Amino acid sequence: PVYPPEHVAVIGAGIAGAATAYALASRGVRVTVLEAGAAAQAGSGNRQGLLYAKISAHDTEQTELLLGGYGHSRRLLDKLLPERENWQPCGLLHLNHNAAETRRNTQLAAQTRHAHLYRGVTAAEASVIAGIDILSDGLYWPQGAWLHPAALVRALLAHPAITLCEHQPLLS
């Protein structure tokens, strides 16, 4: 039989490290998170992040993995940040900002397999959704969300089986 570890160390207290620690702690493993600086710095320290599944226009295993992760992320946000002051599922407009994005978004809008997640919109439709003038077409993700990444990191690291050790640089 394979026995799970009793205690592990995770290096880094950004979103990836905090999520890894939380997943392990949720399965009964004690976790020590070692962070060279403070938790939720670098990209995880941004004031705001966007949540949507940046999937391929083609049906691939990676697309299915991303969609599964997207659904899991939404459920986890509901569980960890129920008050909605640090995230909001308010929808997201992904505008066509160059030729490559226009091609990609047009291909996505044409396929119907994931139509429950997004739909193509004209500039006029995007303007109505946003409440301001929008000059380009794009995709609308009604289930898209904004979030405060540092709040998510703090919520993940608050698990009772996680010990956070900040300002602990590792030497090679």
Q: What residue ranges belong to the model's regions?
A:
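Gly/Ala-rich phosphate-binding loop of Rossmann-like dinucleotide-binding domains
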Residues: 21, 25
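Helical element adjacent to the flavin cofactor pocket in flavoenzyme catalytic cores
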Residues: 139-172
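Conserved beta-strand segments of alpha/beta enzyme cores
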Residues: 30, 117-119, 163
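Dinucleotide-binding Rossmann-like beta1-alpha1 core, especially the glycine-rich loop
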Residues: 49-129
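Short loop/edge segments at beta-strand edges and connector loops
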Residues: 35, 122-123, 166-168
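Beta1/beta-strand and adjacent pyrophosphate-binding region of the FAD-binding site
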Residues: 3-16, 32
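Glycine-rich FAD pyrophosphate-binding loop
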Residues: 26-45
